[in-house]
Amino acid sequence: MSEYAYRATILIPVYNAEKYIGKCIESLTEQTVGFENIEILFVNDGSTDSSEEICRSFSERYENVSLLSKQNGGCASARNYGLPKAQGKYIFYLDADDCLKNDTVEAVTDFFDSVYDEVDLVTYRIIQYY
């Protein structure tokens, strides 16, 4: 058994993202690594729209999805708040208005596994959809 509960944690700061969060969530459920192997951590950063309710609904349906809430402090503050709670071997930061290609988590984690003692950071191409 691995010392990690998940292959990866996707940490998502959320602030007034009701317009985009659904597409973000959809991109995570379609990951080729298997959705059950990914932990999703939403950190609501004081949203005033329905973002928190959307994330809560998603977290109530899946045990690998959690919603944390805090007062607004900005993206970095939300990431720092969520990071200690992450249970994945690898941590991905994803903004609530972004999506991942369906093989991103698998490709990045496979790469990290192959160069585990040599590489500390990987970036990937971002494509705007709006």
Give the location of each predicted region.
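Nucleotide-sugar donor-binding/catalytic module of glycosyltransferases
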Residues: 1-130
